[in-house]
Amino acid sequence: MEKDKLQMIADHYGIKKQLRQLAEECSELAVEASHSARKGLTIGIIEEIADVEIMIEQVKYLGRISEDDIQEVKEAKMERQLERMKEENNG
């Protein structure tokens, strides 16, 4: 059901509009993250994360980006970060 709603919205607006909206939502999340770092977590961070996740799902759908593609990149990035941390601890 949720997937159908996301796809209907994504199809209505199209990739260019949804990429712009994703950028806007990410900006709002960044502002809220900065605020939360100073004042502590609030409901605002949850709302902004939800907005970004909704937009990411739409962009993945419109761009035909698979979970496997994303997972592969995430794994490589996490491995690279773990290596950096290891170097920090040894340096």
Question: Model-predicted segments: where are they?
Answer:
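Flexible "arm" and connector segments at domain edges
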Residues: M1-G91
